[in-house]
Amino acid sequence: MKKAIQFGAGNIGRGFIGGLLSKAGYHVVFADVNQEIIDKINEDKKYTNFVKDVESSEIVITDISGVNSTKPELIDEVKEAEIITTAVGVRILPIIAPSIAEGIKARKENGSEEYLNIIACENAVKASSQLKEAVYGNLNDEEKAYADKYVGFPDCSVDRIVPPVRLDNPIDVVVENYYEWNVEEASFKGAVPQIEGMNLADNLMAYIERKLFTLNTGHCITAYLGNYKGFKTIDESIADEEIFKTVKKAMQQSGMALVNKYGFDKDAHFKYIDKILNRFKNPYLVDDTARVGREPLRKLSATDRLTKPTMTALEYGLPVDALLAGMAAALKYDNAEDPQSVELQDKIKANGVKAALKEVSGITDEKILEDVVAIYEAM
């Protein structure tokens, strides 16, 4: 029996990667700290993905089990796995790394020569590489040499909107029809697993930045502008003509940065932008602006979805006014239930908008900082 472990039994884990692994013939073990969800997975041994779009459908995911990721039983699962995936949030990767390391140690002690590939499916650049660094921090030199030979950490980019919709069954999930999972082929160890829906890529960074600069950039700007105007959901926000125009323009500006950097076909990329805008309009996905906008400090950071495309566009001498409007809207994001939002607003109150933006984004270009402040103050 082929075994896969999916760290994170949340909406993305169940509604995207876990489902693809199950369809590919793996027994999928969901590892999570939420004992209630783990118990329900073990009780039902199946759940349903409700695909919500113009044409809706239901996909039943079977051959699953669950394990509490804080329990020693997890190590036994890692010992037997062929593939491990994660959907826990990039900040949690260092927390799960020791368990993965213990499993690798156990494989070495057992003399296992089976290959294991570990793919961190997170909204972050090179998340698997980050996880590898955290795992290797828990291994000695001999264990690292074993992992170098038998354990792969292919980086990937993932794209699927899975909103937190409450259903009668807590493990059922609502998902959009569209998804994309691009995985770096050269980093696999052993035979590359055959998983329908997993696209093997040789220039992964182009895919990662295409997704980051397009879906992630457009999504968060929609959320921040929508939140500023009092809208609660993404589809309500993008239906506002002014927001739609700003978001589309920002995505086209980040898109031109990609065209210049990677040689993407402009017409094809602009069609990709239109496809994503239509995904935002999907009325069947009730996606909160608070969810999409959460953690503004991370989203304003130098390598993330607002600052990175802006600075890349500037490298090529391209206009960035709509991207700067997105930054200004992020600085306006005030949500008492989001610790990063509270911290951001505290920084603004203490030091002013310009100093706060400079600190969180790493931007040193005075004109850009002043342009964002001007947009912020005009809002």
Question: Which residues make up each language-model segment?
Answer:
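Substrate/ligand-engaging "lid" and interaction regions
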Residues: 1-5, 11-379
